[in-house]
Design a protein with these regions (language model features):
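N-terminal Rossmann-like FAD-binding beta1-loop-alpha1 element of flavoenzymes
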Residues: 3-30
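Dinucleotide-binding Rossmann-like beta1-alpha1 core, especially the glycine-rich loop
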Residues: 47-129, 156
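Mid-domain catalytic core of redox enzymes
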Residues: 24, 222-331, 335-343, 348, ...
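Active-site/ligand-binding neighborhood in enzyme catalytic cores
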Residues: 108, 118-229
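Feature captures the FAD/FMN-dependent oxidoreductase FAD-binding
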Residues: 67-79, 85-95, 145, 149, ...
């Protein structure tokens, strides 16, 4: 008889686990509280275009994601495009893609530009990142790159990304961000990958393959508890329905996982508190189409506190108009703690405030030429990698027998992203197969 496996969460980690295990002969059911799959990379339609609710792309070094796309037959829809980066500071936009751009970056004194470049080169070549776990990114950059570079470049980016946690994030996290971008670059510069048809192309194929192998996706099913029935399987309760499985893999945020398993005898209050020790920050993203080409750059880092968001992206500049149907597609994003006003404000007021910010950056921007727009809010967008983080990382096998956890908090020192979600899914699928006797290896290796 097939072993019954439940997966909680239909993001890319959960979908990858479900795909691998259903291919290997397991009876798979995936629970997802939302009415859609894909997690943060989930798609929607705007102005007739398939888009993501928050910006996503692949690096050329994203081997797990590229391998899965090849395996599923959708790599033909993926193209890599030249990226272009700028930094907005003190009311001006500066190119920021190449070493030469850094040398021309006048907000820094000339020697500090040289110093910043040398620090970046050092980090790109650094292999032993372990010493960076004991110092915050802001402190390390202040000491190594200098106070001016820290104030102009790094502190605004950390504040925009982590808000109140900006001075707590450790340097090993920032090293990993710099490292992956270095690995993804060719001699011609950074290239980023995007699917024609959006990431829904990959999400839909995963869903199709899971269902073709007999797996089930229960969308709109919020799991409220996971309980080991002491020799009689693992019980999952979603709404008024309970089902029993041989094993359960949760792909939810770590603190949420603690709440789901807290009624098991192996889980005391201290363990729930330990799981909730990892803090998360949320994200708010606006997507809009316009008949205006606002900027020649794809990525805009906002290092100016007068602008009310962290990043501004022009997807059309990256992908070209053939992917976006001749329309200009833009993303505006901000990371915020759960108590931030953006999470309680109505969508129109947030978007109106951000449109004024875009107007401040680009005086020629005309909000009346926006064709369609949408706003999305995510409460668990990014885990906080702070001092002592290594001691907080949860194990893949929980203290409850037969219950497992796979999420972004375990990929340290790397940061979240589609490739790492798929990588974690591959790892967990192999772990489950080993526990129950592997039927076949299905990770393409």
């Amino acid at each position: 008889m097939k072993k019954r496996i439940a997966i909680v969460g239909a993001g890319y980690t959960g979908l990858t686990i479900g795909y691998r295990l259903s291919q290997a002969g397991f009876d798979v059911t995936i629970y997802e509280k939302e009415n859609y799959a894909g997690g943060l990379a989930s798609g929607f339609q705007l102005d007739g275009l398939p888009l993501e609710k928050i910006w996503h792309f692949l690096y050329m070094s994203d081997h797990d994601a590229l391998g899965l796309a090849e395996e599923l037959g959708v790599k033909k829809y993926l193209a890599f495009h030249d990226s272009s980066v700028s930094t907005y500071y003190d009311g001006k936009l500066f190119p920021f893609s190449t070493p030469l751009d850094l040398l021309r970056f006048k907000p820094l004194a000339f020697w500090n530009r040289i110093r910043t470049g040398l620090v970046a080169l050092y980090l790109q070549r650094l292999k032993n990142w372990k010493p960076l776990t004991h110092v915050t990114a802001l402190d390390w950059m202040t000491r190594r790159a200098g106070q001016q570079a820290a104030k102009v470049i790094w502190e605004p980016l950390l504040k925009g990304k982590f808000g109140e946690y900006h001075d707590k994030v450790i340097m090993s996290w920032l090293w990993a961000r710099i490292s992956i971008r270095t690995r993804s670059k060719e001699n011609t510069g950074e290239k980023l990958g995007y699917f024609k048809g959006g990431f829904a192309v990959l999400t839909d194929r995963l869903k199709e393959e899971i269902e073709k192998s007999g797996g089930r996706l229960r969308l709109g099913s919020a799991v409220v508890s996971i309980v080991n029935k002491e020799g009689r399987g693992i019980d999952i309760k979603a709404g008024e329905r309970s089902d029993t499985y041989d094993a359960v893999v949760a792909t939810v945020p770590t603190g949420v996982f603690g709440e789901l398993i807290k009624s098991n005898k192996e889980v005391g209050n201290a363990h729930v508190e330990r799981l909730s020790a990892i803090d998360y920050i949320g994200a708010v993203a606006m997507v809009f189409t316009s008949d205006q080409k606002i900027s020649p750059f794809y990525w805009h880092n906002i290092n100016d506190p007068k602008i009310p968001f962290l990043v501004f992206l022009s997807n059309t500049v990256l992908t070209g108009e053939d992917v976006t149907g001749g329309k200009n597609v833009y993303y505006v994003g901000f990371y915020a703690s759960h108590g931030h006003a953006y999470f309680s404000q109505d969508e129109d007021s947030v978007m109106s405030e951000w449109e004024k910010g875009i107007k401040d950056m680009f005086p020629g921007f005309d909000p009346s030429r926006i064709r369609e727009k949408a706003l999305f809010k995510f409460k668990h967008a990014q885990h906080i990698v702070d001092l002592g983080y290594e001691e907080k990382i949860p194990a893949y096998e929980s203290v409850v027998p037969g219950v497992y956890l796979a999420n972004f908090s375990q990929i340290y020192p790397d940061d979240r992203g589609i490739n790492f979600a798929i990588q974690e899914g591959n790892k967990m699928a192999l772990l489950i197969q080993k526990k129950f006797g592997s039927l076949q290896r299905t990770d393409g290796r």
